[in-house]
Amino acid sequence: MSDISKKSNNGILFALGGGIVLSMNDLAIKALSGSGYALHQVILLRAFIGIAIVLGVIWASGGGFRQLLTKRPLDHLFRVSIVMCSNITYFVGLSLMPLADAVATSFVAPLFVTLMSAVILGEHVGPRRWAAVAVGMLGVVVMTRPGAGVIQPAAILVLISAFCYASSHMMTRRMGLTESAMTLNFFVQVGFIVVSIGFGLVAGDGHLAQAPGSTWEFLFRPWHTPPMADWWAFIATGVAVGVGGLMMSQAYRTTQAALIAPFEYIGMPMAIFWGALVFGTFPDGTAWVGIALICGAGLYTLWRETVRKKKDLDVAAPSGDI
């Protein structure tokens, strides 16, 4: 196996693993949103756990904390701002929508990633991969059923989140030449901590609390001390964002963004699984059609990429220039 093929396969595995782990984050925050907690409190506790994991991995790897030093502070500030916007809009939308609906709506992000990777990064995206992404997005449309009233303020927030999420991955790809996955993840967690503490100082006493059921209720709730029974969810969010974030950053910094993006569709079946197991919700027939289109598109993209690589190697092999 060539170095390029090995790197691509590793990137795909990181993306799949990161998507599965990050699905636990959606599950836990969805549960916490129904338990009276404020979003900025959840993000703060999650970030403390996540940054502890990142620092622990750095210490265990023996690479030293010098790898957290950066010559690109402004790029990190811009990327952290985008990630923060993506998180806030997504989780506010998630608090108001069924888990599977929110995740399905968020899957416009891979389409944005593919578009940006071609236009901004200049990566080659063949017509078959474009077609596969289009089929996947058709599945998202089937899942969200806009004619049935799914397109609402909460769904618009998730769409905004998807655009910001795709933009953050373009930044990850550009910064990956000089910044490690550890560094990228560390500065995101620091940003979460700073913004959440600031937000808590302004709104944590509840004087900006919104009416129950309003769009911004989750964001402006007052802080309160979690009982032991709820700590599993806070720990799950921290572990998910720490481990899953590292895996996803590693995938995007080492592999073409257009190849990685379809494998984030693993979050869809995971959302179905968690929704059925924890919240007692299960997809109907229409939803299953959407899932088939989405997953089928991702698998087809993997197959097309494998065929393309084999052809490239067959052409290059006679000259030894691989």
Indicate where each model-derived feature is located.
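C-terminal transmembrane-helix exit sites in multi-pass transporters
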Residues: A109-A131, P269-A287
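Loop-to-transmembrane-helix transition segments
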Residues: G11-L16, G64-T89, P153-L159, Q210-V243, ...
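Transmembrane alpha-helical segments that form core, pore/gating elements
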Residues: K30, V54, V150-G213, F220, ...
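C-terminal-most transmembrane helix of multi-pass membrane proteins
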Residues: P269-I322
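Hydrophobic/aromatic residues within transmembrane alpha-helices
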Residues: L32, V42, G93, L99, ...
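Hydrophobic transmembrane alpha-helices of multi-pass small-molecule transport proteins
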Residues: R128-R145, S161, T286-E305
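Helix-helix packing/entry segments at the starts of transmembrane helices
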Residues: V103-V108, G176-G191, G242-A276
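Transmembrane alpha-helices of multi-pass small-molecule transport proteins
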Residues: S35-C85, F163-M171, V188-G204
